[in-house]
């Protein structure tokens, strides 16, 4: 009985709270029907239908969709991350139907992303900040826009792996262990296999995230103000030692996702993609005005040139306030001990 009691005592009740709070975000998905009017709602069903045709034909990775492009076919999953569709296909084969499978994956993406964020922040800062971060991550306005306005299946699933990649980077930088490097590699590969766009955006942020963590860790062991000409070279060597496992994990992640990433990068010139970047999709016409980040306006339309978009770009009052509070430790003389917890 003692081992069972110890296992029960180790269970974190906040996990249940994260799942319960996720119901506020996924409640509409639990109701009958399907949001056909959302931006990519039809596309998600079409993609799954074509993907299933390939699976039923015995093709484990169906890159070619024969019914697209007016029946001429199109290598859609050669350039579009297939992981979210693989998960939807599993639920379809279990009998959920096309629309049911898409709704299940959208709902699970919210729950899983909250649990992933909770695990990451708990490791760094503890349970209470982790619970706040997880709930905020699940219900920030953009996540709700992604689900109920854009119906962006792949992007919604990608946000499961964002905190896992951050967790992997933090763990690999704080302790040189094989499991940390492998975990980072699989998280980064899964993100690439889900959404190359989110991967690109996160990678740009990772540059600053990794630099800040590495410099902070190096400063703890060798304060910058004590650097001399003689100690500079050993300091740089130590900095490289800290960065090596992170770089190795990210490189291995790219290698693991090469089955998708390599054809996507080398063969995209053979596929017409200009219609994705021109006309109404031209990104140069969709820069957001500063006030739109704080505007409470909510719409179900699309982004148009100028500030009169019929879709929300708000950051959300609560996330902004929490972000400002998160900056307070920077003004303390002594950093929080939680940031140096072993990985």
Named regions from a protein language model:
Residues 23-113, 135, 140-158, 269, ...:
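Membrane-interface coil-to-helix junctions
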């Amino acid at each position: 009985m003692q081992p069972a009691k110890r296992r029960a005592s180790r269970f974190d009740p906040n996990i249940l709270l994260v799942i319960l709070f996720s119901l506020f975000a996924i409640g509409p998905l639990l109701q009958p029907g399907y949001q056909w009017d959302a931006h990519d709602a039809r596309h998600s069903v079409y993609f799954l239908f074509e993907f299933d045709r390939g699976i039923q034909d015995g093709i484990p990775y169906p890159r070619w969709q024969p019914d697209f492009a007016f029946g001429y076919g199109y290598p859609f999953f050669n350039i579009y991350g297939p992981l979210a569709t693989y998960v939807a296909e599993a639920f379809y084969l279990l009998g959920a139907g096309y629309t049911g499978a898409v709704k299940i994956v959208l709902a699970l993406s919210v729950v899983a992303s909250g649990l992933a964020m909770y695990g990451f922040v708990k490791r760094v800062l503890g349970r209470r900040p982790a619970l706040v971060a997880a709930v905020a991550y699940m219900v920030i306005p953009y996540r709700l826009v992604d689900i109920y306005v854009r119906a962006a299946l792949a992007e919604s699933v990608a946000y499961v792996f964002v905190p896992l990649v951050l967790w992997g980077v933090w763990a690999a930088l704080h302790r040189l262990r094989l499991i940390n490097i492998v975990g980072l590699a699989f998280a980064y590969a899964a993100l690439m296999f889900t959404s190359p766009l989110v991967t690109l955006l996160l990678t740009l942020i990772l540059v600053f995230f990794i630099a800040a963590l590495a410099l902070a860790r190096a400063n703890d062991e060798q304060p910058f103000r004590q650097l001399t000409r003689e100690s500079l070279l050993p300091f740089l060597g130590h900095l490289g030692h800290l960065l090596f496992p992170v770089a190795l994990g990210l490189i291995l992640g790219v290698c693991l996702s090469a089955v998708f990433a390599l054809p996507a990068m080398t063969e995209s010139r053979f596929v017409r993609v200009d219609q994705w970047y021109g006309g109404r999709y031209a990104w140069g016409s969709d820069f957001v005005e500063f006030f739109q980040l704080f505007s409470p306006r909510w719409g179900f339309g699309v982004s148009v040139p100028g500030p009169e978009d019929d879709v929300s770009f708000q950051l959300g009052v609560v996330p902004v306030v929490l972000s400002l509070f998160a900056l307070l430790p920077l003004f303390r003389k002594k950093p929080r001990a939680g940031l140096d917890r072993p990985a």
